[in-house]
Amino acid sequence: MSATVPEIRSENLLRYTVIGSRRPSVYFWAVALTGGGLGFTLAGLSSYFHRNLLPFSDPASLVFIPQGIAMLFYGVLGSLAGLYQWLSLYWNLGGGYNEFDRRTQKITLVRQGFPGKNREVRLEYDFAEVQSLRVELREGFNPRRAIYLRIKGRGDIPLTGVGQPPPLAEIENQAAEIARFLNVSLEGI
């Protein structure tokens, strides 16, 4: 699954949707952590109350200290980690879009954050502020394929989302399309 998906392409507007936390791996970990945490919590409570709360095993025969309390502790931790994963999915952390508008000569980068006053992070730049587009390609154990917007006096701003690196051809095509649209040079390819 790609980190950015082209949404709108026209002569005057280019918009890419950035997938945040709503990736298949996050769904998998949310289910696994919630299920495991619930199982361990019920096993710990079964050993405390001496009553079987799990249909597929008999944790009521466990001694509460140290096995039951350890299982209860790990169950609560797993459940909290699962809750965090579900909330990050609900809030779509990191999701947003990159919009390049020729009419207004503006670049708008929007990302979703945690709830509160600054939930939506919105960055706006003029086309004139853009120095170039940089592509980072790093292979190996921890591969990285990313596109950065170089802004004069401000450094590099990532345009691609996190997660599984997109295919090389997709990164190259997207970077070339954005560089052509902005009429700037492309570095790193």
Swiss-Prot record:
The lineage of its organism: Bacteria, Bacillati, Cyanobacteriota, Cyanophyceae, Synechococcales. The keyword Glycoprotein does not apply. Seems to be required for the assembly of the photosystem I complex. Keywords: Membrane, Photosynthesis, Thylakoid, Transmembrane, Transmembrane helix. HAMAP family: Ycf4 (MF_00437). Its main location: membrane. It is a multi-pass membrane protein. The keyword Zinc-finger does not apply. InterPro entries: PSI_Ycf4_assembly. GO terms for cellular component: photosystem I; plasma membrane-derived thylakoid membrane. The gene is ycf4. It is found in: Cellular thylakoid membrane. This is Photosystem I assembly protein Ycf4. The chain crosses the membrane at residues 25-45, 62-82. One of its GO terms (biological process) is photosynthesis. Belongs to the Ycf4 family.
